[in-house]
Amino acid sequence: MSFSDQNLIWIDLEMTGLDPDVHKIIEIASIVTDSELNILAEGPVLAIHQSEEELAKMDEWCTNTHTGSGLVERVRGSQITEQEAVEQTIAFLEKWVPKGVSPICGNSIGQDRRFLYRHMPELEGYFHYRYIDVSTLKELTRRWNPEVLKGFSKQGTHLALDDIRESIAELKFYRQTIFKI
């Protein structure tokens, strides 16, 4: 175990839609890496129970994707509340990273942070205000050097833990190809 203020916290959420004022979080996962992007630990992967009324707010894409992955079934069978998910996730993070020092890391992580701010403010407050958003590098690469993108592809399962692993792998790819480190 390596508690360090240099460790990075990676988070991914799956939601019932894109509007944090309307939609809910249905899955959360976290991973802690060291500063070299080596995975140190995987946190709890939690399907968060939501009512049928909340699940009915999903659009066709969300319904098809989250049903096809088995997530909707896991959400329906879950007893985990949003607050329990916060508590379990923070209990995991406290073993690896001090509060307030790690940027929030992931792909399109600003969207996840909006949901955390609205639905899990205690967890959102665990992060530094900065972001490490892998999608920023992807968007810049797509515009400035699109050939590089042919060297990396994602499975796109839209399951939180898989998405984090892919985000870490994608950042490692950019580190090697763009930054040559």
Swiss-Prot record:
It comes from the Bacteria. GO terms for biological process: DNA metabolic process. The active site is at residue 129. It is an enzyme of class 3 (hydrolase). One of its GO terms (molecular function) is 3'-5'-RNA exonuclease activity. Its EC number is 3.1.15.-. It is found in: Cytoplasm. Keywords: Cytoplasm, Exonuclease, Hydrolase, Nuclease. Its main location: cytoplasm. GO terms for cellular component: cytoplasm. Residues 8-171 form the Exonuclease domain. Belongs to the oligoribonuclease family. NCBIfam families: PRK05359.1. 3'-to-5' exoribonuclease specific for small oligoribonucleotides. This is Oligoribonuclease. It comes from Vibrio vulnificus (strain YJ016).
